[in-house]
Amino acid sequence: MFADLGYDIEEDKLGIPTVPGKVTLQKDAQNLIGISIGGGAQYCPCLYIVQVFDNTPAALDGTVAAGDEITGVNGRSIKGKTKVEVAKMIQEVKGEVTIHYNKLQADPKQGMSLDIVLKKVKHRLVENMSSGTADALGLSRAILCNDGLVKRLEELERTAELYKGMTEHTKNLLRAFYELSQTHRAFGDVFSVIGVREPQPAASEAFVKFADAHRSIEKFGIRLLKTIKPMLTDLNTYLNKAIPDTRLTIKKYLDVKFEYLSYCLKVKEMDDEEYSCIALGEPLYRVSTGNYEYRLILRCRQEARARFSQMRKDVLEKMELLDQEHVQDIVLQLQRFVSTMSKYYNDCYSVLRDADVFPIEVDLAHTTLAYGLSQDEFTDGEDEEDEDEEDTAAGEPPRDSRGAAGPLDKGGSWCNS
């Protein structure tokens, strides 16, 4: 466009250096090398690579990248040609084709502008919105917003809640079993003391046997605690290390994804701006000066897409391993728990079945005398009533009357009233 005015405009490279080079690519079965071309006459003084497609000769070779300028095909200059003419030149060559290029030495940090940062924030907000809400607010949703890994993250949160509940329940259960074992130990101590003090041999042996049974149950409880406690450690390891690590990886993946989507949206906006100017017939400065800003964004988009693909692959592998570990671990822990509980109850039943000593015959009178040797003779009050009746029959006042004090006479002696 500016050439029609009678003068040329120098390319505005934005301080980005370029390095010339050439690469020979072997075409695939469809006679393609796997690149898309942009720029060219009549609006842009140079032609450049817009995108390198995956699993194509250009992508597998890795020499050229998005944003690189194409200067020739098989030694023929393409200056002043349109992108359609250059595409035909490449298609006419069979087998191997040599591409001459100027490598764009771009720094991805140059493309990380405030606009990209704001777009990342917008994508974060739109991520958790429904389509209706986003449309009502006038926010566009990128194609990757409904990502399956986000749902996997929600499943991971539910799994974390499951493990947290199991951990708390196991802690409470272990605490209850510890208190129960201490109760059995106290029972054993009490019955052991009773058995030692019991004078009758048969009853003493029965109490001691019953005490030993409770002490055995206490040992079974301690063994259960030692067996199940590692289960609690494994659950905490999965809950506090594996799940947070995966959650952090997914958050990093989402950050890379939002960055890639931001560059895609930026490219779309710049394309729309260019098409609008072409439709109006007005020259666009950045296009007429080599479109280096657009090519920088193309390079940033390609690198962001590569990071996004690699991060997505890593997250999928980690999620798969975590799911397998979850299935295997939960089955192993539940089997350990059930087998330990079953063994505990079977052992308790076996011990109590062998300790079936009831009913126990105890001589209460003999036991009372044996336990009361160090105490005074026991009286129930009936003997005192008998003595009072005998004193009354002999003409003596009862003890209550004798013990009562009368008023004093004038001489200071006691008298009976």
Swiss-Prot record:
InterPro entries for this protein: AH/BAR_dom_sf, AH_dom, Arfaptin_fam, PDZ, PDZ_sf, PICK1_BAR
UniProt domain AH: residue ranges: 144-357
Binding site for Zn(2+): C44, C46
PTM field: Phosphorylation at Thr-82 appears to inhibit the interaction with AMPA receptors.
Chain ranges of the PDZ domain: 22-105
Post-translational modification Phosphothreonine, affected residues: T82
Positions of S-palmitoyl cysteine lipidation: C415
UniProt-listed GO biological process terms: cellular response to decreased oxygen levels; cellular response to glucose starvation; dendritic spine maintenance; dendritic spine organization; glial cell development; intracellular protein transport; long-term synaptic depression; negative regulation of Arp2/3 complex-mediated actin nucleation
Keyword Metal-binding (UniProt): yes
Primary location: cytoplasm
PROSITE patterns: AH, PDZ
Region Disordered: start-end pairs: 375-417
Quaternary data: Monomer and homodimer. Interacts with CXADR. Interacts presynaptically with the glutamate receptors GRIA2, GRIA3, GRIK3, isoform 3 of GRIA4, isoform A of GRM4, GRM7 and GRM8; with NAPA and NAPB; and with BTG2. The interaction with NAPA and NAPB disrupts the interaction with GRIA2, conducting to the internalization of GRIA2.
Comment on protein domains: The AH domain mediates binding to F-actin. The unoccupied PDZ domain is probably involved in allosteric modulation by forming an intramolecular bridge with the AH domain leading to a 'closed' formation. Binding of a PDZ ligand, such as GRIA2, allows enhanced interactions with F-actin and the Arp2/3 complex thus enhanced inhibition of actin polymerization.
Function summary: Probable adapter protein that bind to and organize the subcellular localization of a variety of membrane proteins containing some PDZ recognition sequence. Involved in the clustering of various receptors, possibly by acting at the receptor internalization level. Plays a role in synaptic plasticity by regulating the trafficking and internalization of AMPA receptors. May be regulated upon PRKCA activation. May regulate ASIC1/ASIC3 channel.
PANTHER family, alphabetized: ARFAPTIN-RELATED, PRKCA-BINDING PROTEIN
Name the UniProt record assigns to this protein: PRKCA-binding protein
Organism name: Bos taurus (Bovine)
Higher taxonomy: Eukaryota, Metazoa, Chordata, Craniata, Vertebrata
